[in-house]
């Protein structure tokens, strides 16, 4: 009955490898660092154990969403590298992200191409003979 496992606390204690809170939650964003920022920022006197995990998950989701849309915009423009212009196009073409980041200016993002309907030429207005002048005199 004398096994090396049991024995009432005799022998060396087994050391376990440290597991980060990010890996426990299945996240890539750093839970510990966000917890440290929340505590240092004095947003509240105390910070719950689940708050940095939840915030990390939200930030990771938002980053993944923006990166996916920006990657699609880069691919549409036949580019391999995401630049600020692609992020701008991704954010402004997505209704929810555009509302969330409505007041945010993205450096070197440019503007969305937009021509008002009034300024566009009229579509097929009547006679339309082939080879006729574009304006009637």
Curated annotation (Swiss-Prot):
Matching entries from InterPro entries are given as: Histone-fold (IPR009072), Histone_H2A (IPR002119), Histone_H2A/H2B/H3 (IPR007125), Histone_H2A_C (IPR032454), Histone_H2A_CS (IPR032458)
Gene Ontology MF terms: DNA binding; protein heterodimerization activity; structural constituent of chromatin
User: Where do the record's region annotations for Disordered lie?
Assistant: 1-21
Q: Which Gene3D superfamilies match?
A: Histone, subunit A
Give the Gly residues compositional bias ranges: 1-10
Its post-translational modification remark reads: Phosphorylated to form H2AXS139ph (gamma-H2AX) in response to DNA double strand breaks (DSBs) generated by exogenous genotoxic agents and by stalled replication forks, and may also occur during meiotic recombination events. Phosphorylation can extend up to several thousand nucleosomes from the actual site of the DSB and may mark the surrounding chromatin for recruitment of proteins required for DNA damage signaling and repair. Widespread phosphorylation may also serve to amplify the damage signal or aid repair of persistent lesions.
Per the UniProt entry, the signal peptide is none
Has the keyword Phosphoprotein been applied to this entry? yes
List the PROSITE patterns.
HISTONE_H2A (PS00046)
GO CC annotations? nucleosome; nucleus
Q: Pfam families from the entry? A: Histone (PF00125), Histone_H2A_C (PF16211)
Q: Which domain of life is it from?
A: Eukaryota
Per the record, the similarity remark reads:
Belongs to the histone H2A family.
Q: This protein is called what? A: Probable histone H2AXa
């Amino acid at each position: 009955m004398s096994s090396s496992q049991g024995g009432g606390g005799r022998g060396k204690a087994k050391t376990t490898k440290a597991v980060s809170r990010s890996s426990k939650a299945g996240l890539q964003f750093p839970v510990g660092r966000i917890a440290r920022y929340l505590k240092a920022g004095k947003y509240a006197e105390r910070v719950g154990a689940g708050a940095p995990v939840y915030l990390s998950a939200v930030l990771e989701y938002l980053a993944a969403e923006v990166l996916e849309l920006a990657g699609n915009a880069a691919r549409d423009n036949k580019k391999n590298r995401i630049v600020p212009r692609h992020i701008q196009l991704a954010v402004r073409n997505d209704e929810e992200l555009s509302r969330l980041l409505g007041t945010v200016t993205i450096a070197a993002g440019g503007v969305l191409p937009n021509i008002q309907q009034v300024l566009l030429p009229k579509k097929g207005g009547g006679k339309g003979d082939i080879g006729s002048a574009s304006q009637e005199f």
